[in-house]
């Protein structure tokens, strides 16, 4: 089987007046397996002044089922049989899974009310939003060989708030804070458990001079699929000037888990609670 997907998208912005800014966009998608769709986005911004604004946003999105979900033809071949079958040491497992072949797209509708403000004297940027998202036609069935019956019969709703604070404490120091609260409702209990009710982060970034910089971040959520998540990331970097417009950044990052929980699923367990990796970035 094969699939071909074409997408076309565009965006339009209209400055209606000194205080009103209208933004609109749309994406057209044509998929061989599921047909075509048009998803719009419109945002109305009211600028109280150049540094403070309110916004109302409505958008739609789709997710087309992948080829595995829609057209799977799945079975196992067993080898090394202790008792040969028809003189053969291998045989096809009796369970065979086939996709329905007629799945529709998942549809998401999102509504948002938000505020963004920059406080010059404090060098502080604040963004707060309220949102309500709903997904219909969800394909929620787990991909199991013995009981996979895919359908578009599930739905989810998410309501909550998100906030972000970016504070330039000094020329060298910067503080970032985020927090999100989500109330999730889903027809399939497995979908509902995959959303944490409370999550957030706190970070301190510092420029030490002479190309040295560091970042210290804490990430946490209350329960992701029933498991708490807490981690601290430490990053140290050195930027080397290689020319007037060329530079090389060498960095090392340590990720330290503060909990003893799996990541989302019970069998997602790391051998070590800390991970170290290095990176190199060339800009020219």
Question: Model regions: which residues?
Answer:
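Transmembrane beta-strands of outer-membrane beta-barrel pores
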Residues: 4-6, 26-32, 58-64, 71-73, ...
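Residue-level signature of outer-membrane beta-barrel architecture
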Residues: 13-14, 28, 36, 46, ...
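Hydrophobic, lipid-facing positions within transmembrane beta-strands of outer-membrane proteins
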Residues: 4-10, 26, 38-44, 99, ...
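Membrane-embedded beta-barrel scaffold of Gram-negative outer-membrane proteins
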Residues: 47, 55, 87-152, 157, ...
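Conserved C-terminal beta-signal and adjacent last beta-strands/turns
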Residues: 56, 167, 171, 175-178, ...
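Outer-membrane beta-barrel translocator domains and adjoining extracellular loop/strand segments
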Residues: 1, 34-40, 67-73, 80-81, ...
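Gram-negative outer-membrane beta-barrel transporters
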Residues: 15-21, 124-139, 151-222
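Surface-exposed extracellular loop regions of Gram-negative outer-membrane beta-barrel proteins
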Residues: 1-45, 172, 176
């Amino acid at each position: 089987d094969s699939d071909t997907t074409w997408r076309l998208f565009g965006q339009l912005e209209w400055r209606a007046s000194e205080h009103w800014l209208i933004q609109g966009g749309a994406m057209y998608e044509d998929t061989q397996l599921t047909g075509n769709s048009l998803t719009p986005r419109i945002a109305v911004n009211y600028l109280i002044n150049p540094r403070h604004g309110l916004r109302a946003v409505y958008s739609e999105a789709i997710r087309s089922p992948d080829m595995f979900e829609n057209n799977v033809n799945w079975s196992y071949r067993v080898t090394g049989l202790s008792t040969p079958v028809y003189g053969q040491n291998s045989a096809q497992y009796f369970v065979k899974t086939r996709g329905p072949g007629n799945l529709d797209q998942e549809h998401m509708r999102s509504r948002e009310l938000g505020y963004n403000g920059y406080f010059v004297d404090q060098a502080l940027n604040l963004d707060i939003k309220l949102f309500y998202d709903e997904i219909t036609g969800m394909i929620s069935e787990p991909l199991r060989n013995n009981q996979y019956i895919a359908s578009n019969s599930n739905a989810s709703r998410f309501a909550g708030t998100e906030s972000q604070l970016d504070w330039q404490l000094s020329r060298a120091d910067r503080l970032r804070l985020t927090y999100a609260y989500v109330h999730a409702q889903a027809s399939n209990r497995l979908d509902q458990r995959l959303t944490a009710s409370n999550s957030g982060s706190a970070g301190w970034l510092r420029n030490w001079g002479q190309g040295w910089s560091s970042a210290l971040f804490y990430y946490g959520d209350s329960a992701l699929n029933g498991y708490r998540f807490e981690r601290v990331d430490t990053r140290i970097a050195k930027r080397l000037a290689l020319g007037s417009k060329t530079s090389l950044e060498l960095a090392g990052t340590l990720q330290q888990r503060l909990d003893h929980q799996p990541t989302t699923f019970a069998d997602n367990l790391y051998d070590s609670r800390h991970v170290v990796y290095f990176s190199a970035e060339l800009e020219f």
